[in-house]
Design a protein with these regions (language model features):
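S-adenosyl-L-methionine
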Residues: 75-105
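Conserved beta-strand signature within the Rossmann-like core of class I S-adenosyl-L-methionine
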Residues: 140-148
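Glycine-rich SAM-binding Motif I of class I
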Residues: 50-54
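Conserved SAM/SAH-binding beta-strand->alpha-helix loop
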Residues: 72
Length: 183
Protein backbone atom coordinates (compact mmCIF):
# COMPACT_ATOMS: atom_id res chain seq x y z
CA UNK A 1 0.00 0.00 0.00
CA UNK A 2 1.44 3.36 -0.94
CA UNK A 3 1.60 6.36 1.38
CA UNK A 4 -0.99 7.98 -0.96
CA UNK A 5 -3.54 5.36 0.06
CA UNK A 6 -2.63 5.86 3.72
CA UNK A 7 -3.18 9.61 3.33
CA UNK A 8 -6.51 9.00 1.57
CA UNK A 9 -7.66 6.71 4.38
CA UNK A 10 -6.50 9.27 6.96
CA UNK A 11 -8.73 11.89 5.32
CA UNK A 12 -11.66 9.52 4.73
CA UNK A 13 -11.72 7.55 8.01
CA UNK A 14 -11.79 9.53 11.27
CA UNK A 15 -10.33 6.52 13.10
CA UNK A 16 -7.07 6.47 11.10
CA UNK A 17 -4.57 8.18 13.38
CA UNK A 18 -1.49 8.75 11.22
CA UNK A 19 -0.65 10.07 7.80
CA UNK A 20 2.59 8.07 7.70
CA UNK A 21 3.48 4.61 8.98
CA UNK A 22 5.58 4.16 12.10
CA UNK A 23 9.23 4.79 11.37
CA UNK A 24 12.07 2.34 12.01
CA UNK A 25 13.10 4.21 15.15
CA UNK A 26 9.62 3.89 16.69
CA UNK A 27 9.32 0.22 15.75
CA UNK A 28 12.76 -0.59 17.16
CA UNK A 29 11.99 1.11 20.47
CA UNK A 30 8.58 -0.54 20.76
CA UNK A 31 9.94 -4.03 20.07
CA UNK A 32 12.78 -3.62 22.61
CA UNK A 33 10.23 -4.06 25.40
CA UNK A 34 9.05 -7.46 24.16
CA UNK A 35 10.64 -10.73 25.26
CA UNK A 36 9.93 -12.74 22.12
CA UNK A 37 11.31 -15.93 23.71
CA UNK A 38 8.47 -15.91 26.25
CA UNK A 39 5.66 -14.12 24.39
CA UNK A 40 2.91 -16.56 23.37
CA UNK A 41 -0.15 -14.34 22.96
CA UNK A 42 0.12 -10.85 21.53
CA UNK A 43 -2.53 -8.32 20.56
CA UNK A 44 -2.11 -5.33 18.27
CA UNK A 45 -4.61 -2.48 18.28
CA UNK A 46 -4.86 -0.54 15.02
CA UNK A 47 -2.23 -2.27 12.89
CA UNK A 48 -3.06 -0.12 9.87
CA UNK A 49 -1.32 -1.57 6.86
CA UNK A 50 0.74 -3.96 8.99
CA UNK A 51 4.13 -2.28 9.32
CA UNK A 52 4.57 -3.19 13.00
CA UNK A 53 2.64 -6.43 12.47
CA UNK A 54 5.25 -7.79 10.06
CA UNK A 55 8.08 -6.92 12.47
CA UNK A 56 6.25 -8.70 15.29
CA UNK A 57 5.70 -11.80 13.15
CA UNK A 58 9.38 -11.88 12.12
CA UNK A 59 10.43 -12.08 15.78
CA UNK A 60 7.64 -14.19 17.29
CA UNK A 61 8.02 -17.82 18.29
CA UNK A 62 6.58 -20.42 15.95
CA UNK A 63 3.85 -21.30 18.47
CA UNK A 64 2.92 -17.70 19.32
CA UNK A 65 -0.26 -16.01 18.06
CA UNK A 66 -0.84 -12.36 17.12
CA UNK A 67 -4.42 -11.05 17.21
CA UNK A 68 -4.81 -7.73 15.37
CA UNK A 69 -7.85 -5.46 15.74
CA UNK A 70 -8.46 -3.14 12.78
CA UNK A 71 -11.69 -1.31 11.89
CA UNK A 72 -10.64 0.16 8.53
CA UNK A 73 -11.73 -2.12 5.64
CA UNK A 74 -8.91 -1.00 3.31
CA UNK A 75 -6.31 -1.84 5.95
CA UNK A 76 -7.96 -5.20 6.66
CA UNK A 77 -7.58 -6.04 2.95
CA UNK A 78 -3.88 -5.16 3.18
CA UNK A 79 -3.45 -7.26 6.31
CA UNK A 80 -4.99 -10.25 4.52
CA UNK A 81 -1.96 -10.17 2.18
CA UNK A 82 0.29 -11.12 5.11
CA UNK A 83 0.53 -14.89 4.86
CA UNK A 84 1.28 -16.18 8.33
CA UNK A 85 -0.77 -18.77 10.20
CA UNK A 86 0.09 -17.08 13.52
CA UNK A 87 -1.79 -13.92 12.48
CA UNK A 88 -5.48 -13.58 13.37
CA UNK A 89 -7.14 -10.52 11.80
CA UNK A 90 -10.21 -9.22 13.59
CA UNK A 91 -12.23 -6.51 11.85
CA UNK A 92 -13.50 -5.01 15.11
CA UNK A 93 -12.81 -2.10 17.45
CA UNK A 94 -9.96 -2.67 19.92
CA UNK A 95 -12.33 -1.41 22.59
CA UNK A 96 -14.00 -4.83 22.41
CA UNK A 97 -10.79 -6.90 22.35
CA UNK A 98 -11.19 -8.45 25.79
CA UNK A 99 -14.75 -9.62 25.11
CA UNK A 100 -13.96 -10.90 21.61
CA UNK A 101 -10.88 -12.82 22.71
CA UNK A 102 -12.77 -14.42 25.59
CA UNK A 103 -15.96 -15.29 23.68
CA UNK A 104 -14.55 -16.31 20.28
CA UNK A 105 -11.14 -17.70 21.18
CA UNK A 106 -11.49 -18.65 24.88
CA UNK A 107 -8.53 -16.42 25.73
CA UNK A 108 -8.68 -14.55 29.03
CA UNK A 109 -5.16 -13.11 29.24
CA UNK A 110 -2.37 -12.15 26.85
CA UNK A 111 1.31 -11.32 27.27
CA UNK A 112 1.52 -8.08 25.29
CA UNK A 113 -0.75 -5.46 23.81
CA UNK A 114 0.85 -3.22 21.20
CA UNK A 115 -1.15 -0.19 20.15
CA UNK A 116 -0.98 2.52 17.54
CA UNK A 117 -4.59 3.64 17.93
CA UNK A 118 -4.99 7.42 18.19
CA UNK A 119 -6.01 7.99 21.81
CA UNK A 120 -6.31 11.71 21.04
CA UNK A 121 -9.43 10.89 19.01
CA UNK A 122 -11.20 9.48 22.09
CA UNK A 123 -12.83 11.41 24.90
CA UNK A 124 -11.24 11.00 28.34
CA UNK A 125 -13.80 8.39 29.42
CA UNK A 126 -13.11 6.11 26.43
CA UNK A 127 -9.32 6.54 26.81
CA UNK A 128 -9.60 5.50 30.44
CA UNK A 129 -11.81 2.51 29.63
CA UNK A 130 -9.57 1.24 26.82
CA UNK A 131 -6.53 1.43 29.10
CA UNK A 132 -8.44 -0.27 31.92
CA UNK A 133 -9.69 -3.05 29.63
CA UNK A 134 -6.17 -3.49 28.29
CA UNK A 135 -4.81 -3.80 31.83
CA UNK A 136 -7.44 -6.45 32.61
CA UNK A 137 -6.54 -8.37 29.44
CA UNK A 138 -2.86 -8.67 30.36
CA UNK A 139 -1.19 -11.49 32.28
CA UNK A 140 0.72 -10.64 35.44
CA UNK A 141 3.84 -8.73 34.28
CA UNK A 142 2.20 -8.28 30.87
CA UNK A 143 2.99 -5.11 28.94
CA UNK A 144 0.97 -2.48 27.13
CA UNK A 145 3.13 -0.68 24.56
CA UNK A 146 1.86 2.27 22.57
CA UNK A 147 3.25 5.16 20.61
CA UNK A 148 1.56 8.52 20.46
CA UNK A 149 2.40 12.00 19.28
CA UNK A 150 1.35 13.67 22.55
CA UNK A 151 1.68 12.84 26.24
CA UNK A 152 -2.10 12.84 26.66
CA UNK A 153 -2.41 9.27 27.98
CA UNK A 154 0.68 9.20 30.21
CA UNK A 155 -1.20 9.92 33.45
CA UNK A 156 -3.85 7.30 32.65
CA UNK A 157 -1.20 4.64 32.04
CA UNK A 158 0.71 5.70 35.15
CA UNK A 159 -2.45 5.50 37.29
CA UNK A 160 -3.44 2.05 36.04
CA UNK A 161 -0.16 0.15 35.64
CA UNK A 162 2.35 -0.86 38.32
CA UNK A 163 5.30 0.45 36.31
CA UNK A 164 5.58 2.83 33.39
CA UNK A 165 8.37 3.60 30.97
CA UNK A 166 8.56 6.49 28.55
CA UNK A 167 10.89 6.74 25.55
CA UNK A 168 11.15 9.43 22.91
CA UNK A 169 11.56 8.61 19.24
CA UNK A 170 12.86 11.98 18.13
CA UNK A 171 14.11 10.66 14.79
CA UNK A 172 10.55 9.78 13.80
CA UNK A 173 8.61 12.29 11.70
CA UNK A 174 6.74 13.59 13.56
CA UNK A 175 8.58 12.77 16.80
CA UNK A 176 6.73 10.15 18.84
CA UNK A 177 6.53 9.05 22.45
CA UNK A 178 6.56 5.36 23.32
CA UNK A 179 4.72 4.50 26.53
CA UNK A 180 5.01 1.11 28.21
CA UNK A 181 2.73 0.08 31.05
CA UNK A 182 3.76 -3.02 32.99
CA UNK A 183 1.12 -4.89 34.98
Amino acid sequence: MTEKILIREFIKDKNVGAVFSAGRNVIKKMLESIDFNKACLLVEYGPGKGVITTHLLERMRKDAVLFVFETNEMFVKELLNIRDERLVIINEDAYNAQTILKNRYKINKVDYVISTIPFTFFDRRKRKRVISKTYNLLNENGKFITYQYTGLIYQLIKQRFHQTRVMAAVLNIPPAIIFTGIK
